Amino acid sequence: MVLSPTTIQHSITSCSWNYFDKKFFLKQKKLIVEKTILYQNKKILYRNIGNGNPVMLVHGFGEDGSVWHAQVEFLKDKYHLIIPDIPGSGRSEMINDMSMEGMAEVLHSIIHEENIDTCTVIGHSMGGYITLALVESYWNHVNAFGLFHSTAFADTEEKKQIRKKGIEFIKQHGAFEFLKTSTPNLFSPKSKSQIADSIEDFIASLANFSPDALVSYYEAMMKRPDRTAILKNTKNPVLFIAGEHDNAVPLDDVLKQCHLPEKSYIHILKNSGHMGMMEETEKANQILEEFLDNK
């Protein structure tokens, strides 16, 4: 049973994310509304900006909501954007159930708090896994969804072994050492050269990540089931954005499942690895806008 948040705290700020240009938002008088809900006595923070049809952008592993900064700036004039920090990331606390299903319940509570009937949900990487769990349980609240460098397949045994090694590294060396080592591999060789400063800044922003959260995410990813049935059965539009140089969610895996939905849209970012919102920002923005406008 989902518990509705009993307490909600509101604060208004020009922006609290390092990646945002605060002056830009003040100049445009576009203020981000920060909200904190209590989900089973744990604080969950999310941000609202803009008006229009609601769109939730769900970040992935080793990130927080600020990873969507360029997309927020691009889409905020046309849509009501909802940007959560998932449990354990950013300024949201870990919850008791850190499974994909447990974190999907948090997203549902945010939708409930916003009094939204239906919204579009776009999930990056692990955020896509959470999105699929949300659609599985609350399909009536999601009118379209997108998998941005994400997959409906369960982990292979090989992938599980890689995650287990990652867990051991995190326990021995800490979260930031792990992220400093692993995050550069998410970018294509071209991106590492062309946006090196942005990648360095992004990694620096992860310094305070919780090792317990990262371990919980890896454990949840290893346990998540195959959800290709969601793709097969949905009547709603589904967006796939894949990176040609993505080692985390290989292009071949995406191509094997993008035909499953009745209404499927597939876009390949030719110069991206796993971080297309940063690597090919303009193209990623255009893809999202086209999907949101025409779904």
Predicted feature locations:
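Alpha/beta-hydrolase fold catalytic core
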Residues: M1-P54, K76-Y79, H112, I116-D117, ...
